[in-house]
Each structure stands twice: as structure tokens, then as C-alpha cells.
């Protein structure tokens, strides 16, 4: 009986938060595209990637997979009341522009598009050139 009371006490319902504005972080690498939607404080509301949406292997790096991932993340975020977003792009993958287009077409109002790609000031040695 003591265990039942402890279990009932610890269970809380997840409250649906109404967040009008947020930030979309799009990380477009050569192998995958990850879309994370946060509130202005940085707490994650929803996320999606090309792998999570169902693509695997070389299809994850396609622009269409990035579009589907962005639509999936936007739909989940709009269910919690999100309307207006700022977009931060990171990386040089194939899904950069297509992810932003998908966010706009899904009904989110995009106020700012920022390029946050990290550029080294001659940091690590780059990987060797690919010879095909």
C-alpha cells in the first residue's frame, strides 16, 4: 500500500505549453540533417532528423529527407502553440535551404534567418581530399 501511494504521488500529467515564438536550429551535415526547435530560453520543444523520419544510409543526406524532417518537427512544435520562429543554419549540407522552405510551407512565420556555421581560424587539420 505504501508503494501505491508513492507511485500515485510521483505521477504528473505533462502540461501543454503555449509558446508563441521560438528558435529553429538546422544542422545540415554531409550525412544527415537535424532540425531542433526550442523556446527562446533554449529548452527543446521538438526535434527531427532525416534518420528519425525513416531514411537510412545515403538517402539521409538528400534535400527531400531534410524537407520531411523539418515538416515533422514543425508539426510537433505547432501543436504546442508555436507560430513565429527564428532560423539558425549550421553546416553546408544538402538540406539547408530545403529545410527552411519546408518550415515556411508548414505554416510557421520565419522572422530571421541566421547563418551560424562554425568557421575555424585555422584550427584543426582538415581531412584528406577524396580521390574518386
Swiss-Prot record:
Among the GO biological process terms of this entry, one is: translation
| UniProt keyword annotations, A-Z | Ribonucleoprotein, Ribosomal protein, RNA-binding, rRNA-binding
List the PANTHER family hit by this protein, alphabetically. 40S RIBOSOMAL PROTEIN S14/30S RIBOSOMAL PROTEIN S11
Xref: NCBIfam families: PRK05309.1 (NF003698), uS11_bact (TIGR03632)
Q: Which family does it belong to?
A: Belongs to the universal ribosomal protein uS11 family.
User: Subunit notes for this chain?
Assistant: Part of the 30S ribosomal subunit. Interacts with proteins S7 and S18. Binds to IF-3.
Q: What GO molecular function annotations does the UniProt record carry, in alphabetical order?
A: rRNA binding; structural constituent of ribosome
Could you tell me what this protein is called? Small ribosomal subunit protein uS11
Q: What Pfam family is a match for this entry?
A: Ribosomal_S11
* Coiled coil (residue ranges): none
| Record GO cellular component, one term | ribonucleoprotein complex
Q: What does this protein do?
A: Located on the platform of the 30S subunit, it bridges several disparate RNA helices of the 16S rRNA. Forms part of the Shine-Dalgarno cleft in the 70S ribosome.
Question: Which organism is the protein's source?
Answer: Chlamydia trachomatis serovar A (strain ATCC VR-571B / DSM 19440 / HAR-13)
Does the record's keyword annotation contain Iron?
A: no
What's the superkingdom here? Bacteria
Amino acid at each position: 500500500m505504501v508503494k501505491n501511494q508513492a507511485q500515485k504521488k510521483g505521477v504528473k500529467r505533462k502540461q501543454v505549453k503555449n509558446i508563441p515564438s521560438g528558435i529553429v536550429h538546422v544542422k545540415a551535415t554531409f550525412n544527415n540533417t537535424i532540425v531542433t526547435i526550442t523556446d527562446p530560453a533554449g529548452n527543446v520543444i521538438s526535434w527531427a532528423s532525416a534518420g528519425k523520419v525513416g531514411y537510412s544510409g545515403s538517402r539521409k543526406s538528400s534535400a527531400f529527407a531534410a524537407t520531411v524532417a523539418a515538416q515533422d518537427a514543425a508539426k510537433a512544435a505547432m501543436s504546442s502553440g508555436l507560430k513565429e520562429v527564428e532560423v539558425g543554419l549550421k553546416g553546408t549540407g544538402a538540406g539547408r535551404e530545403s529545410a527552411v522552405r519546408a518550415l515556411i510551407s508548414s505554416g510557421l512565420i520565419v522572422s530571421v534567418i541566421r547563418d551560424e556555421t562554425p568557421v575555424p581560424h585555422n584550427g584543426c587539420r582538415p581531412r584528406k581530399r577524396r580521390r574518386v
